[in-house]
Amino acid sequence: MDPRKVNELRAFVKMCKKDPSILHTQEMRFLREWVESMGGTATQKAKSEENTKEEKPDSKVEEDLKADEPSSEESDLEIDKEGVIEPDTDAPQEMGDENAEITEEVMDQANDKKVAAIEALNDGELQKAIDLFTDAIKLNPRLAILYAKRASVFVKLQKPNAAIRDCDRAIEINPDSAQPYKRRGKAHRLLGHWEEAAHDLALACKFDYDEDASAMLKEVQPRAQKIAEHQRKYERKREE
């Protein structure tokens, strides 16, 4: 047999091994029938594997899209976002050294800084107030009210994330004080975190009723309830 034809046949067989689906084309029907008449089988395994490989990314993309794409049940929730702002991204503020030694003299110095900070706040000098409250915190980092006061200034500066950090610290020191919950509730409201805002403002009113906190609670609570009800409805749909 012509060696050239043998080489061509060898190349063709190699190609068929790589992609047996070639044997399933109409023009190769005669060869497929001959293979089967000899007791062999001409499967499409390689082709199907190739198709699977080609289809898998599409399937994966489709699954990802389905996961990322909110269902009609999720996307039909409309909440009034009036007053919601973009989150602040400043580096975390100084929190002081909680292991610092605090003498009576240091406490007096911290109190002087606090008084000066409140005066600056009353004069509308917000950044000066922040700086003075920070000085007070560095002197007495275990006094919850200092963090709550500084948080109130951060809220005025529309820096809710900074306010939340201060409130978290204040609550860690004294979890029974109303002020940190009130400030944190206001900060969450600025970010559109309705459920968190409602939770904190409700606690603030529970610890020490405040008309301002109560008024804001009445504003955010319907939105928080709407979200909670929507989530329950969505979960029931998924369980079905």
UniProtKB/Swiss-Prot annotation:
* Major location category of this protein: cytoplasm
- Which keywords are on file for this protein? Cytoplasm, Repeat, TPR repeat
Q: Name one GO cellular component term.
A: cytoplasm
Segments of skewed composition (Basic and acidic residues) = 46-69, 226-240
The stretches annotated as TPR repeats are 110-143, 145-177, 179-211
Q: Does the keyword Disulfide bond apply?
A: no
Q: Which Gene3D superfamilies match?
A: 6.10.250.3420, Tetratricopeptide repeat domain
Q: Where is the composition biased (Acidic residues)?
A: 85-94
List, alphabetically, the PROSITE patterns matched: TPR, TPR_REGION
Q: Which GO terms describe its molecular function?
A: protein dimerization activity
The record's tissue-specificity note reads:
Highly expressed in bone marrow and weakly in placenta, pancreas, heart and HeLa cell line.
Give disulfide pairs as residue numbers: none
Q: Where in the cell is it found?
A: Cytoplasm
**What domain of life is recorded for the organism?**
Eukaryota
Is ATP-binding among the key words of this record? Answer: no
Residue ranges, annotated region (Disordered): 38-94, 220-240
- Family as reported in the entry's similarity comment: Belongs to the FAM10 family.
State the protein's name: Putative protein FAM10A4
Q: Which organism is it from?
A: Homo sapiens (Human)
Q: What is the lineage of its organism?
A: Eukaryota, Metazoa, Chordata, Craniata, Vertebrata
